[in-house]
Amino acid sequence: MYDLTYRPRRLRINPEMRDLVRETTLDVTDLIYPLFIVPGEGIKKEIDTLPGQYHLSVHEAVKVAQEAYDLGVRGVEIFGIPTYKDEQGSSAWDMSQPVQQAIKAIRAAVPNLLVVADVCLCQYTTTGHCGMIDDHEILNDETLPLLCKVAVSQAEAGAHMVAPSDMMDGRVGAIREALDAAGYTNVSIMSLSLIHI
């Protein structure tokens, strides 16, 4: 007979085997649905630059999260637009702001849905940058404690996972330390490379 040491046909013998060893699959349960939370009530306004996506008030976000879960989506990521902005972006860690309120409300209404929260300052600062700025220079190390405050506030609100989207060096390690120190050792950190495929 033939001297065939490599016989890939073995891995194609039936559908179950092929499913088991296939390289890549994508299912609705692999997706995380983005929710863009805004202040106010009864708001569901389409985002011009993201057709099919909406700015949502907290109550509307809860409804969309439930719909997504009912369709098989197992996670949402919360992005926010605050009621106020300042130089530090302090509304990003304010527990009364839309992101933290949406996290709480979604967790209460759809308890089995994974809630991921975006960690950044750009939406919350008057400069629109993800870091503190002094004389046109990003203050990397001074920004890290602020990002930590954001992540801890999101964990306190009930986020299962935080996803830093800023560009500060050392942010993941700093956030991990802050979450652990605050007692949120089971809150995960997700890389942005996993979000945008």
Named regions from a protein language model:
Residues 44-60, 131-145:
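Active-site mouth loops of central-metabolism enzymes
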Residues 1-38, 42-43:
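N-terminal amphipathic alpha-helix/helix-capping segment at the start of soluble metabolic enzymes
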Residues 195-197:
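Conserved small/polar residues in nucleotide/adenosyl-binding loops
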Residues 31-34, 76-78, 115-117, 162-164, ...:
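Hydrophobic faces of well-ordered beta-strands that scaffold small-molecule active sites
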Residues 45-53, 74-98, 164-172:
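Glycine-rich, proline-tolerant flexible connector loops at the mouths of alpha/beta enzymes
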Residues 28-31, 72-74, 110-113, 158-160, ...:
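Short, well-ordered coil/turn segments that N-cap beta-strands
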